[in-house]
Amino acid sequence: MNPMIEFCVSNLARGSQEALEILEKDPNLDVLEYGCLSYCGKCMESLFALVNGEVVTGGTPAELVDNIYTFIEENPMF
């Protein structure tokens, strides 16, 4: 089972699209996109994604990608 990375379409439009495109190239991740993840406050203040159900943020797409990989390393699924 791969880590699940979920993106909100509104946040993609705010800048996290680049992070999604980078992460989609990793065959060890399941990357999904939803209309809304109901984290509107978080969505307005930063780039974010849900990683296995937990919010991970970043100031830039590159920082978001780095933070996602760090989160996955620090929080193994098994």
From Swiss-Prot:
Q: Which InterPro entries match?
A: DUF1450, UPF0349
Which domain of life does the protein's organism represent?
Bacteria
Per the UniProt record, one Pfam family is: DUF1450
Q: Which family does it belong to?
A: Belongs to the UPF0349 family.
Q: Which named protein is this?
A: UPF0349 protein RBAM_029300
